[in-house]
Amino acid sequence: MTETQQKGPSAAEIRKLVERGQQGERAALEELYLIHFDRIYSYLHMTVGNRHDAEDLTTQTFMRMLESIGKFRFQSAPFSAWLFRIAHNLSMDHFRANKRWQPEEEVPEPHGSEERSAEDEAFQSIGRQSMLELIDSLSQEQQQVLTLKFVFNFSNAEAATILDKTEGAVKSLQHRALVSLQKQISGDKER
């Protein structure tokens, strides 16, 4: 989701906050933290599967933001995509260090969307546990693309930036993931 799609500050307001943050203005940095905290935490919680690690990685994400905000440039990607890229990289480092995913609890719903989408309807009809099992059968890259696209509503371009892939690769991963899920769901209904 781009900043203009959020029920929060506009892209221009985010830009001003980033510029003020780059000048070292503490209030602007705090505002950027408050605007992005819930989505970053939810993404990391969904990615690593437990609250403790998600909290640690969220803290590390915002620490990296503070350290690197001076290097951020508004060129091809919005600030939120840059911040999610930091979170994504930290989660990949976490996986390499721990070699496995350890879910321990339910993942919180990200804030923002109150309307039920087609994805929500499908999720309800299949059931939470069944859907989690289906998604778990996908590759890690496919899971990441679906999470960024359908949970966090990022565009293909933004997801590509976050995952350091081409837009075509993101479209391909999404397509293969959805085809795989569709085959699995169709197979389950036939039984």
Question: Where would I find each of the regions flagged by the language model?
Answer:
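Short, charged helix-capping/linker segments at alpha-helix termini
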Residues: E3-Q6, R20-E31, Y41-Q60, E167, ...
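Internal acidic/polar
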Residues: S10-I14, W101-R128
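Short helix-capping/turn signature of helix-turn-helix
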Residues: L34-D38, M46-G49, D136, T147-S155
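Structural recognition of an alpha-helix C-terminal capping motif at a helix-to-coil junction
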Residues: D56-M63, A77-N89
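Arg/Lys-rich amphipathic alpha helix in sigma70-family domain 2
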Residues: E67-F74, R85-E105
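Helix-turn-helix DNA-binding module
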Residues: E133-Q144, F152-A169
